[in-house]
Amino acid sequence: MKMYQPFALTLTALLLILSLSGCYTVPITGRTSLNLVSEGDEFQLGMQAYSDAKSQAKISSDPVANERVTRIGKKIAQVSHHPEWDWEFTVFDDPETPNAWCLPGGKVAVYSGLFPYAKTDGELATVMAHEISHAIARHGAERMSQQMVQAAGAAVVAETVANEHIETAKVV
């Protein structure tokens, strides 16, 4: 029977501890998920991504579209689980992109390409609320945590395989 390498055992134990300590219950749904990213780190990443998006994309100068998105967004934010977030709403002038998103901390973007599909305030509110719910439920942090665990698992496998090759070479 082969003995596991100390590195692999240590990393596996660390992953187990992180997995158990990183369990997070989504307040809205009660669903438990793995979350190894702090809310502060998540907000910082969100702020940076929002700033990058605003510097790279064309921001709409349409006062009607901007007022509509801000008005609807503020109503959703007020009844969300995080009305205290520093909510910001931006319309990007991109008629080819029917999309919207919300980053941690309440940074919301709507692309002008969504307006032909979300003609009424109710339709636009549905899309915006859906995107906002992803941020409130911390889905981005959950995905990052899963990627961290996968990367650590891959490191364990790579180290174990490398050590087995070294041991095999010693025998030969």
Feature-to-residue mapping (PLM):
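A Zn2+-metalloprotease active-site environment signal
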Residues: 4-8, 12, 20-172
